[in-house]
């Protein structure tokens, strides 16, 4: 049997990013052959990714990439916030965003296929299930800027705009904070407006107000509703005395569109009852 030295293990670990014990076992199995050991680890890392695939990945980070006039915002998930902070995981998320901006894939499945080998490698290294949850690409003749909030990178926005980059970035910060649904009233679905109008009308009737006053109340509430959900109508967080539309106009800037994500939106996180697990283990 070939002697497995500490240097051999260290070299294999440097090449694969996997744990020392995993590298040593692979070298033993390969009888000291470095290339064969590396192949064994690649195969096993793929198997490991398969074993972890069923586990809920509800933590993660956002990443963006801007390649000329093409920008991408992606959400990449993992299982724990500990791994979400790992430099290797963050690097993988940035690679996913870069790939999305360069290749402009048509679906999450297509993007996932493009980064599958890198995904398996980082899963093997960190031991958690990971997945590309969602992404969007903006391909435009206009300008693009992105803003990711905080060190944890869990909320962010990609903004398509005309005008000042600094102004657009500030509006991006506003979007993350105020969470508008769209840019302008023209983008609000008519069915949504009618649904709100019906609710407000019923409330006005129930209050016993005269019909003319009730009608004015309804229209006032509709205006308020539209101002709250549209970017242009919202009070600007950095100066609530003016709307975002007013701030943009006075700075010769126009927001054309935006994509806003928050990590984990809509994912049901598994709640682990550790006491129950310990009790069950004690019975075995």
From Swiss-Prot:
Compartment(s) of residence: Cytoplasm
UniProt-annotated stretches for the region Involved in Mg(2+) ion dislocation from EF-Tu: 80-83
Gene Ontology molecular functions: translation elongation factor activity
Main location: cytoplasm
CDD domains named among the record's database cross-references: UBA_EF-Ts
Keywords recorded for this protein, A-Z: Cytoplasm, Elongation factor, Protein biosynthesis
GO cellular component, one term: cytoplasm
Main function: Associates with the EF-Tu.GDP complex and induces the exchange of GDP to GTP. It remains bound to the aminoacyl-tRNA.EF-Tu.GTP complex up to the GTP hydrolysis stage on the ribosome.
Family: Belongs to the EF-Ts family.
UniProt protein name: Elongation factor Ts
Species in which this protein is naturally found: Neisseria gonorrhoeae (strain ATCC 700825 / FA 1090)
Source organism phylogeny: Bacteria, Pseudomonadati, Pseudomonadota, Betaproteobacteria, Neisseriales
